[in-house]
């Protein structure tokens, strides 16, 4: 099956517009991330090829929405959230209920988003690793 990339990208642009609106409401943004994570966990086998990327997209979007990490351009967060909105939509270019092929377009979009924001994600990973180290040092020093 050949992907209609233009149709997928047009649908993704609509998802990004929705994401921009969702991002202005912290509760909606949090729920969108939570719902997308739930769908991802349920369909982990179909998403194996993008699983680690997807977890990183969830983490940075959650930390951004919670106000823990804001050193990422808003356009990057909108792209990430747009990818999650696209992923959440059961009726997109290839409906998710279509056996075997249902997630092909979702994986295409998630990979596209990842490539678009990879530099921002690398900075986020450095920050996140520092946070984990810092917390580990606090835990280690209080245990002594």
Task: Set out the residue ranges of the language-model regions.
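Alpha-helical transmembrane segments that serve as single-pass membrane anchors or pore-forming helices
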Residues: 75-118, 124
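Terminal, membrane-proximal amphipathic helices
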Residues: 1-77, 115-144
């Amino acid at each position: 099956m050949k992907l209609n990339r233009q149709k997928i990208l047009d649908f993704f642009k609509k998802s990004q517009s929705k994401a921009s609106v969702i991002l202005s409401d912290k509760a909606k943004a949090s729920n969108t991330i939570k719902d997308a994570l739930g769908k991802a966990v349920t369909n982990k086998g179909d998403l194996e090829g993008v699983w680690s990327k997807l977890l990183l997209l969830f983490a940075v979007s959650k930390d951004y929405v919670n106000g823990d990490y804001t050193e990422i351009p808003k356009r990057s967060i909108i792209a990430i959230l747009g990818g999650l909105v696209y992923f959440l939509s059961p009726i997109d270019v290839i409906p998710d209920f279509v056996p075997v092929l249902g997630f092909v377009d979702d994986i295409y979009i998630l990979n596209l988003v990842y490539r678009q924001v990879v530099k921002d994600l690398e900075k986020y990973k450095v920050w996140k690793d520092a946070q984990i180290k810092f917390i580990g040092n606090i835990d280690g020093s209080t245990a002594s």
